[in-house]
């Protein structure tokens, strides 16, 4: 799989960013990032991993989008 492009239509639709710390969005809270999201399919992937929202794409472990769901 290839890395998700922040400027792709699907990424833009969900306000996806590779660096969650730089996100300026009303839904974003500190500490939220792909690696601790329920939709991140491989929590052991610490740099880039799969996401249920973006099939066949890799998202950054420190990324964020509006589909974020806290794990656990």
UniProtKB/Swiss-Prot annotation:
Keywords: 4Fe-4S, Electron transport, Iron, Iron-sulfur, Metal-binding, Transport. GO terms for molecular function: 4 iron, 4 sulfur cluster binding; electron transfer activity; metal ion binding. [4Fe-4S] cluster binds at residues 34, 37, 51, 65. Pfam families: HIPIP (PF01355). It comes from the Bacteria. One of its GO terms (biological process) is aerobic electron transport chain. Belongs to the high-potential iron-sulfur protein (HiPIP) family. Specific class of high-redox-potential 4Fe-4S ferredoxins. Functions in anaerobic electron transport in most purple and in some other photosynthetic bacteria and in at least one genus (Paracoccus) of halophilic, denitrifying bacteria. This is High-potential iron-sulfur protein isozyme 1. It comes from Ectothiorhodospira shaposhnikovii. The lineage of its organism: Bacteria, Pseudomonadati, Pseudomonadota, Gammaproteobacteria, Chromatiales.
